[in-house]
């Protein structure tokens, strides 16, 4: 695995992302060309994200994930997509982006828009890296009760944990993730770097 990784990608504009790869991974078009260089160095979280990216080749086989949390509008989704692009740029790695609110029985069985035609469930459970974006929003739709969707989200997180596959999660608060299922807090604290995204300043 390590032989496929390129240390010079962070991302570098000399290697622009392949559009078809972005489409096949369901990455939002808005995030196709975002760069860590656009984040001001004064942002404390930036170095932790850089460190995670630089050590992906070492932690991938251990299933080391990343949980990005913070207020809405701080760029968590963009950061997650930048990291996901690293997995795709550094080797022939299958990757996938999914909104947490779209993870339900019907959504999981739709065909993805890739030549292979993998069902979403296969992508979520088998891709080397997966982003689950805005985790916790499905709880807000039904007040304090956990919705049916959350059960599927929990299955994805636990399944990837058991198979030691890295997952990148964005949320407004870690507590929203912990509340989805019994024991998830222990999983997150064991296998994820937890990074608060705040005070972001996107240049350019």
What is each model feature region?
Residues 46, 50, 88-127:
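Short glycine-rich substrate-engagement loop in P-loop NTPases that contacts/grips substrate
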Residues 133-135:
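Walker B catalytic acidic pair
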